[in-house]
A protein has these predicted regions:
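Sequence-specific dsDNA recognition surfaces
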Residues: 39-45, 59-74, 85-116
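Flexible loop/turn segments at secondary-structure boundaries
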Residues: 80, 89-91, 128-130, 242
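Short coil/turn segments at secondary-structure boundaries
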Residues: 29, 71-78, 96-97, 174-176
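A short beta-sheet element
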Residues: 83, 104, 109-167, 173-178, ...
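Glycine-anchored helix-breaking recognition loops at helix->coil/strand junctions
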Residues: 4, 84-87, 142-146, 162-222
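Secondary-structure transition motif
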Residues: 21, 27-28, 154
């Protein structure tokens, strides 16, 4: 959808402006770097960063786990499951309406149930592609996906865009090689800039408004699609006609 494409581009532009160019608003509301904010050289990143920021490995900020492997003949309870095709056919938000349903024992499923603040990352197929779930209730993730659980939930939106830098290139921080698969070790080893909490809080206020608008657009689009399909069915069955007057 064009509106959501524009909204997603806006969110990415905000992230880049604040955390790549470092022109987040300073205490006076002016762009930090452009207004002469203090910068220091970071040897890990080989670039300057704001003096009030730090750099740590992603593994210190999140827990990672691989998804569930299952067979079709298992018995137990029904669960929704996120597959790689759900990631590849979406942008940043997943609404769950197209998820498959599988049956597995609860004792097996409980280690793979997604939580509200989890981030999901494709291991293969579209390696490095990163998504958020609108609702994680009773939803598992498949073995070709890695789940990233931030230790601090307020960092989730920021970390999503840090991880989305993998999309397309999947370059490691050490060798810059292009990966066919993404592993937990690759993700844990990523060097991540950690902004001050008050800056993250300001970022969240804006990004959550954008996400809310994207969600509304998704709902509106699905409602219109449903109405269109129902009308087409009536037309095909001769139960409705188009007035040409």
């Amino acid at each position: 959808m064009l509106i959501n494409d524009n909204l997603e581009a806006m969110a990415k532009q905000l992230y880049d402006y604040w955390f790549v160019q470092f022109d987040f608003p300073n205490e006076e509301g002016k762009p930090y770097k452009s207004s002469g904010g203090a910068m220091v050289w970071n040897e890990k990143l080989k670039r300057e960063i704001p003096s009030c920021f730090e750099v740590v490995n992603m593994g210190k900020l999140c827990d990672f786990r691989n998804g569930i492997n299952y067979s079709k003949d298992e018995t137990g309870n029904d669960y929704q499951i996120v597959n790689v095709r759900n990631i590849s056919s979406s942008r940043i938000l997943l609404d769950g309406e197209d998820f498959d349903v599988i049956t597995v024992p609860t004792s097996k499923a409980e280690n793979y149930v997604l939580k509200p603040d989890d981030i999901i990352i494709a291991r293969s197929g579209c390696p490095g592609s990163t998504r958020l779930l609108l609702s994680s209730a009773n939803t598992l993730f498949c073995g070709f996906i890695i789940c990233c659980s931030p230790n601090d939930s307020s960092m989730r939106n920021y970390l999503v865009y840090c991880l989305k830098q993998l999309e397309g290139t999947n370059a490691t921080t050490s060798g810059g090689s292009i990966l066919q698969n993404v592993s937990q070790d690759t993700l844990k080893g990523l060097h991540v800039i950690v902004p001050k909490k008050q800056i993250i809080d300001k970022f969240n206020k804006t990004i959550e408004l954008i996400f809310a608008r994207m969600l509304n657009c998704l709902k509106e689009s699905k409602a219109l699609t449903k109405q269109r399909d129902e009308l087409l069915l009536l037309l095909m069955n001769g139960q409705a006609s188009v007035n040409s007057d």
